[in-house]
């Protein structure tokens, strides 16, 4: 799998100074975490899950979550589980024919997760799926906290599954988890610090099992009876942005964990109250004013602004609930040529000092920015480096056509 794999070779050469790396499910975990990008959620009740997964992978999705939790009514859980088990079995069968070679219907590889409700459900699904679990990268764990011991119970269930997989097939790839931070214990101010401390402790003790940490902004907002409009970003909702800041402070340090951006809920047009958040000049310079209008009509300017703020606050990738969001997240995850040269400049001078940047427009201080440079180079491997004259408008145009 590779980001922007749908682009032609000439288009890739035009857009990228350094193309995204080819990835596999066996790639280094830090690279896979950085490469998650737009993680597209899909309810497990979809009537043709396999078709949906194949279609979205072909369109550029690199990570998907099949959801058995909040997107599924309680009464529909048994049917959703059966549907999921059948879909994973079909995907597994299509990956290899009886001779062990890929079949003609083999879907593009992507990171596929299942969002479960309870540790017991995780264990039950694993038993029902058997070898079909090979198509998964892991599980998404809701309302992750360890004050009640819930986090450890989920991790114990994961260990049971991985032990069984290794016993059945020595060398089997271990499954990992992506916890979602959305529990009221972590949201409310009086319990937040102690809860985050406990979360960090259990994550650190089980670091090899953790791919990335996700933020559940919908549950955070609902804890206060709030919901942001399409004219606002999650960072305008101060009580929620304060929680995000504390999460990054505790878990997002250089020796911490990859943390993904919260979901953007809006995808249809409607009456607007505030001015659009996309300047017209970058689109005019690229002769793409029509693209700007398309983004505004679909209410995607707010998403673009929120992605910028996610990145400024140390978050990588984003949870998305509509396929139209995927190309925007990925286009805005490409590293600029300027940032790439800065990262190379800084990482090559670990002894310290300061010097003008390669673009001669800022001061690069070598020691303070080592962690930023290292992170930027990992992201460059995942999403590529834009060519010197390529802007995010060019990447958006190529991604959305």
Question: Each PLM stretch: what is its role?
Answer:
Residues 1-401:
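Expand to "…catalyze enediolate/carbanion chemistry for C-C bond making/breaking, isomerization
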């Amino acid at each position: 799998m590779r980001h922007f794999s749908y682009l032609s070779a000439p288009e890739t050469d035009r857009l990228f100074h350094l193309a995204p790396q080819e990835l596999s499910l066996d790639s280094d975990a830090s690279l896979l975490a950085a490469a998650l990008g737009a993680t597209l959620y899909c309810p497990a009740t979809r009537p043709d899950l396999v078709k949906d997964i194949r279609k979205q992978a072909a369109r550029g999705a690199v990570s998907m979550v099949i959801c058995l939790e909040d997107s599924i009514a309680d009464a529909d859980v048994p049917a959703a589980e059966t549907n999921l088990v059948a879909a994973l079995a079909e995907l597994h069968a299509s990956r290899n024919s009886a001779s062990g070679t890929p079949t003609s219907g083999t879907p593009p590889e992507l990171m596929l997760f299942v969002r479960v409700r309870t540790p017991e459900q995780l264990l039950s699904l694993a038993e029902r799926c058997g070898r079909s679990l090979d198509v998964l990268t892991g599980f998404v764990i809701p309302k992750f906290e360890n004050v009640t011991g819930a986090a450890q119970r989920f991790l114990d269930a994961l260990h049971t599954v991985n032990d069984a997989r290794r016993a059945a097939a020595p060398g089997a790839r271990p499954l990992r988890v992506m916890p979602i931070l959305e529990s009221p214990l972590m949201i409310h101010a009086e319990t937040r610090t102690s809860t985050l401390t406990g979360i960090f402790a259990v994550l650190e003790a089980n670091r090899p099992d953790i791919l990335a940490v996700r933020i559940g902004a919908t549950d955070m907002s609902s804890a206060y009876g709030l919901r942001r409009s399409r004219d606002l970003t999650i960072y305008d909702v101060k009580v929620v942005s304060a929680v995000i800041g504390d999460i990054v402070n505790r878990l997002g340090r250089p020796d911490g964990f990859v943390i993904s951006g919260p979901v953007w809920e809006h995808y249809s047009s409607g009456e607007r109250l505030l001015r659009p958040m996309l300047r017209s000049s970058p689109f005019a310079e690229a002769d793409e004013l029509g693209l700007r209008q398309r983004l505004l009509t679909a209410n995607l300017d707010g998403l673009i602004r929120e992605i910028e703020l996610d990145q400024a606050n140390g978050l990588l990738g984003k949870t998305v609930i509509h396929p139209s969001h995927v190309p925007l997240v990925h286009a805005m995850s490409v590293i600029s040529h300027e940032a790439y040269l800065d990262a190379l400049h800084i990482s090559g001078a670990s002894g310290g000092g300061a010097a003008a940047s390669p673009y001669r427009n800022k001061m690069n201080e070598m020691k303070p920015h080592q962690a930023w440079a290292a992170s930027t180079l990992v992201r460059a491997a995942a999403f590529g480096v834009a060519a010197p004259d390529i802007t995010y408008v060019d990447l958006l145009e190529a991604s959305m056509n």
